[in-house]
């Protein structure tokens, strides 16, 4: 019973981050097509603000109550000024809560952490939870392998929880995951059965306790889902606010894992293939991206933290011979195919490209997703080809997670394809 109460309070705590600082309904500029999507903008803004806060030389406990209280007060102000933002549809709100409760109970019962979580992410979260600041991470031997932000969120929401148990911080990962899936649905009340099927289908395909065992892939996966949906919205409605949110999502990805820079660049290149993308917006996108990367580089240099201690060395790359390249490529294809068969989203995407071959480069969204997919494949191959590590061990221990993370780029593309072809109505409903 205590766990259920704590999980319920955590859910409502997380909701505050959807309800402030913006009252999205106040301006047409900030309006999505359904109420439950509006909060995602606030969530993205809040998470970016937390990145800045996490870098400050203050103890977590010294500012967390003030920050959360400010969000609560702003939420109340928004409610009094324009209550619509709080009028979550009862059906989707109940659905959201039930799913969150079920998955959170699974997390609370199983508890075991993934290998990387034990050695990297949890230890980093303890630094913040025990009121050390970002600067102290330089004292942690394995800190430079990956950025800190996912661990910071773990500590931040653990401190906000009722029981302050370790798993309480990870419940935010569940919340972000479910928020990203529900973000795909424009109008939940319309075609309720279809929308229920979509969510359950995605849960069936993607849910596994392992992704909530402290590993950070679920954060990037969720943010990639949101990003591709925002790209689609921008292509259709040309609202600058969508482009702004895309840039903020890219920034979040940059601070979560070392490979975040690869997804950052993949999205950046894909966006530059938008037709009629005027010089002003293109320049703003490139300049913003440059500033974000430069800012992270500056922060790491200032705190004397290595940007990336992953096993990639120019000397090793230059010494690669043809036999080694063929051996690595063969195994990359074998393991890539095997894990793609286990991840149906990644497997289906090329099939959709084949079905849509007539409009692949005529339709803007299809073209950009195709370019992103090709860049994604190039990244996966390069990541293993140029890595100075035993290839079989590396593939067996990490390929499944890279495939899972990357599949976040194609979740909305898959759902959008099924809707447009009326496959749900034709074969399921």
Predicted regions and their residues:
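Hydrophobic, aromatic-rich transmembrane alpha-helices
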Residues: 18-24, 177-189, 268, 272-275, ...
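Membrane-embedded glycan-lipid processing machinery
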Residues: 146, 154-157, 165-175, 207-219, ...
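Membrane-interface alpha helices of multi-pass inner-membrane proteins
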Residues: 53-55, 209, 242-258, 264-269, ...
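Membrane-embedded helix bundles of polyisoprenyl
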Residues: 43-50, 96-100, 171-188, 193-234, ...
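Membrane-embedded, hydrophobic transmembrane alpha-helices
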Residues: 1-86
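Membrane-lumen/periplasm interface segments of specific transmembrane helices
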Residues: 109-110, 273, 280-357, 376-380
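Perimembrane helix-loop-helix junctions
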Residues: 79-88, 236-237, 263-288, 359-360
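Extracytoplasmic catalytic/substrate-binding loops of multi-pass membrane glycan-assembly enzymes
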Residues: 110-124, 130-153, 164
């Amino acid at each position: 019973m205590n766990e259920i109460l704590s999980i319920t309070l955590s859910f409502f705590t997380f909701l505050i981050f959807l309800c402030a600082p913006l009252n999205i309904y106040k301006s047409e500029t900030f309006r999505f097509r359904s109420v439950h999507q509006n909060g995602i903008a606030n969530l993205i803004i809040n998470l970016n603000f937390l990145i800045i806060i996490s870098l400050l030389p203050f103890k977590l406990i010294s500012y967390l109550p003030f920050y959360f209280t400010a969000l609560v007060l702003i939420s109340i102000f928004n409610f009094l000024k324009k209550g619509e933002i709080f009028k979550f549809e009862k059906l989707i709100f109940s659905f959201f809560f039930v799913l969150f409760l079920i998955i959170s109970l699974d997390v609370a019962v199983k508890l075991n952490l993934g290998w990387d979580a034990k050695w990297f992410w949890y230890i980093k979260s303890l630094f913040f939870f025990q009121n050390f600041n970002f600067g102290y991470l330089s004292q942690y031997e394995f800190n430079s392998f990956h950025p800190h932000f996912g661990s910071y969120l773990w500590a931040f929401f653990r401190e906000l929880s009722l029981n302050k148990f370790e798993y309480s911080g990870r419940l935010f990962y569940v919340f972000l995951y479910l928020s990203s899936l529900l973000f795909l649905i424009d109008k939940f009340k319309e075609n309720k059965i279809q929308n229920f099927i979509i969510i359950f289908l995605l849960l069936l395909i993607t849910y596994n306790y392992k992704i909530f065992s402290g590993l950070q892939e679920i954060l990037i996966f969720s943010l990639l889902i949101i990003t591709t949906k925002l790209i689609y919205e921008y292509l259709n409605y040309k609202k600058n606010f969508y482009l702004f949110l895309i840039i903020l999502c890219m920034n979040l990805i940059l601070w979560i894992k070392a490979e975040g820079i690869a997804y950052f660049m993949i999205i950046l290149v894909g966006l530059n293939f938008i037709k009629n993308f005027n010089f002003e917006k293109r320049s703003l996108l490139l300049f913003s991206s440059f500033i974000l990367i430069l800012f992270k580089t500056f922060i790491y240099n200032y705190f004397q933290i290595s940007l990336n201690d992953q096993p990639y060395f120019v000397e090793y790359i230059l010494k690669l011979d043809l036999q080694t390249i063929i051996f690595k490529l063969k195994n990359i294809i074998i393991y890539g195919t095997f894990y793609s068969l286990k991840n149906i989203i990644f497997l289906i995407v090329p099939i959709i490209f084949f079905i849509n071959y007539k409009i692949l480069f005529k339709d803007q969204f299809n073209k950009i997703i195709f370019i992103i997919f090709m860049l994604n494949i190039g990244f996966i191959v390069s990541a293993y080809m140029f890595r100075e590590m035993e290839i079989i061990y590396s593939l067996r221990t990490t390929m499944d997670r890279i495939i899972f993370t990357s599949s976040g780029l194609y979740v909305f593309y898959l759902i959008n394809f099924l809707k447009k072809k009326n496959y749900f109505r034709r074969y399921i409903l």
